[in-house]
Design a protein with these regions (language model features):
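Conserved anion-binding
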Residues: 1-90
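A polyampholytic, Gly/Pro-enriched intrinsically disordered region
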Residues: 3-7, 133-140, 161
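Electropositive phosphate-/nucleotide-binding environments in soluble metabolic enzymes
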Residues: 25, 64, 68, 98, ...
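A general structural detector for well-ordered alpha-helical segments in enzyme core domains, enriched
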Residues: 31, 70, 100, 104, ...
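Short, solvent-exposed amphipathic alpha-helical segments in soluble enzyme
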Residues: 33-36, 59-62, 105-110, 129-133, ...
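Surface-exposed amphipathic alpha-helices with a cationic face
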Residues: 35-36, 75-79, 103-108, 176, ...
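A C-terminal functional module that forms or caps the active site or interfaces directly
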Residues: 91, 95-142, 146-153
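C-terminal helical cap(s) of enzyme catalytic domains, especially alpha/beta-barrels
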Residues: 128-134, 149-186
Length: 186
């Protein structure tokens, strides 16, 4: 909320925002306060999909990678703001690191995991299985470029730019089939 004089405004009414944990608790706590008050959520950057993420996120602290320590903090923060089955505190964990995703899912069983890196960055349905709980829930898979610009991919080029919507629909249908198939075959 933004206070202007005696009036309070809601400039954006998003349900979740992404938060960088490297400011520490005093940088995250204001967001947790909003989670509690408004039943909104945050996704905390834990293990991102970009190739250089390991420069910091994989650093060892007392024999453990930093991303695991951040994952534990996400789980602790999440206990403060539980929804029906999942916490309002989720995590960003890249599809390009499925083994780390498996470890982090165990650390954060009640957190939604936002999974970038599917499609354009190389993540495939089989890579995503560790991010989901055993019931097939708990992960939100993102594929921005793979969907928005599907018509630029060889597979969907026949649609052309003028039919980008149809190309995007086909890409989404293929993505659903890929992920669903991988989850069924786990």
């Amino acid at each position: 909320r933004v206070q202007v004089g005696s009036k309070s405004y809601v400039p954006f009414d998003e349900d979740f925002v992404t938060v960088n944990p490297y400011l520490g608790s005093d940088g995250v706590n204001p967001f947790l306060d909003v989670c509690k008050k408004e039943k909104k959520g945050i996704f905390v950057l834990v293990k991102t999909s970009n190739p250089s993420s390991g420069e910091f996120q994989d650093r060892q602290i007392d024999g453990r990678p930093l991303y695991e320590l951040v994952g534990e903090k996400v789980a602790a923060w999440g206990e403060e703001v539980m929804g029906d089955a999942y916490s309002y505190v989720g995590a960003v964990v890249g599809a390009t690191y499925p083994e780390m995703g498996r470890t982090l899912r165990k650390i954060m069983p009640k957190a939604y995991i936002l999974v970038p890196g599917y499609g354009a960055q190389g993540g495939k349905g089989a890579d995503l299985v560790p991010f989901f709980n055993e019931d097939g829930l708990g992960a939100i898979v993102n594929s921005s470029r793979g969907i928005i610009a599907a018509y630029k991919q060889e597979k969907y080029a026949g649609f052309g730019a003028e039919n980008f919507g149809e190309a995007s629909r086909a890409a989404v249908e293929d993505m659903i089939a890929d992920i669903s198939g991988a989850l069924k075959n786990r």
